[in-house]
Structure formats: structure tokens, C-alpha cells
């Protein structure tokens, strides 16, 4: 794999260069850890307000993301994924521009949805590649 060149945009607009700032991403109030190769989120207690994050990978890059429910996402070059820092009790939804491979953690009570423009892919737990 090549270099990641990925950037994370936090809800307050801060941009984190994930390749440069690896190993130190236990930011105050955030529930993720970055090791320079992947970004891993952890479940939070119910009732905490959902914050939307955006992972952006430019041309020539790639990055792996583990969402709070354990779903693994490989985000390809020239792609962007908007996702919550944790999921609600009844649904799991992300928004994709570009291409990604998903290994979705099975949860029959909370469908997993990928929104791609005016299209939506909804699954309960499976692996698939999608490009928009």
C-alpha cells in the first residue's frame, strides 16, 4: 500500500493529517485512535450527542477505518466518507463520495446504510465494494 495522505475533518472544522499526527489522536472528547494506517472508533454510552466526522483521501492515497460498531471500511483514493462518531440505537448510516470496501458488522436490529448521492444501499451485515 502507498502512503495514506488521509485527512480527518472534525465537527468543529479542525483538520487532522492522519499520516503526520499518528499515535497521538486520543483528542479530548473524541472516541478514536489513529496509528497512521487506520482510524479506530470505540462505542460510546447511549445518550451522548452524535458528532459527524469526515474522512477524506486524496488521489494516490488510501485509508482503513473501523467504525464504532466494528464495521471495517477501506476508503479508496479520491474518496470521502462522512460518518457519525457512534451510531444511534436504531440505525447505522454513512455517506460516501467515491469508492470504498465495507465489511459490515451484523446487527439485525440496526440496518447499515451507505448513502451515495440519491441512492442508498442498506444491509444487515455483509461485505461489499461500492463506488459512486
Q: Which residues does each PLM region occupy?
A:
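Short acidic/polar, Gly/Pro-enriched loop/turn segments located at secondary-structure boundaries
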Residues: 1-132
Amino acid at each position: 500500500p502507498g502512503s495514506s495522505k488521509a485527512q480527518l475533518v472534525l465537527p468543529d472544522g479542525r483538520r487532522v493529517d492522519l499520516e503526520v499526527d499518528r499515535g497521538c489522536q486520543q483528542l479530548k472528547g473524541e472516541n478514536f485512535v489513529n496509528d497512521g494506517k487506520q482510524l479506530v472508533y470505540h462505542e460510546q454510552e447511549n445518550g451522548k450527542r452524535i458528532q459527524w466526522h469526515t474522512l477524506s483521501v486524496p488521489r494516490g492515497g488510501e485509508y482503513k477505518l473501523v467504525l464504532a460498531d466494528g464495521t471495517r471500511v477501506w476508503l479508496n483514493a479520491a474518496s470521502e466518507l462522512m460518518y457519525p462518531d457512534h451510531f444511534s440505537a436504531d440505525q447505522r448510516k454513512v455517506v460516501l463520495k467515491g469508492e470504498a470496501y465495507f465489511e459490515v458488522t451484523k446487527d439485525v436490529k440496526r440496518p447499515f446504510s451507505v448513502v451515495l448521492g440519491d441512492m442508498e444501499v442498506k444491509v444487515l451485515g455483509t461485505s461489499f465494494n461500492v463506488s459512486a
